Amino acid sequence: MVDIYLCDDVPELRHLLRIILEEDPGLRVVGETGDAQIGIEEIAELQPNVVLLDLSMPGMDGLEALPLIRRAAPDTSVIVFSGFTEAKMAALVLERGADRYIEKGESLERVRETVRELTISR
């Protein structure tokens, strides 16, 4: 079973992601939040296999949260799932420790495929 944590400030998107991810019987969403600070605390406790992280959130953004998530859960894969489409942003988040960068324009099925790819390769 692959445990996934969702960190995005849009509740409707988190709901859709949960539905798409849990269509795969090997994937399970173990937690979610719209607040990066709460996310870091819960990720440290839950130690999920994968975190889906948005960059643009109120308070602490995903770019600030990324290294803190890495410290709190070093064995967790982080997929940044963001509306920023600039190549520079993708390069920056990968440089800061994300395992993958997916634009929100991609299909939600692509997110599920990426989760699977990451967890198979580990």
Residue ranges of each PLM-predicted region?
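Conserved acidic segment of CheY-like receiver
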Residues: 1-12, 17-21
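Short hydrophobic/Thr-rich beta-strand motif most characteristic of the beta2 strand and flanking loop
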Residues: 26-34, 42
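Acidic catalytic/metal-coordinating carboxylates
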Residues: 35-38, 61-64
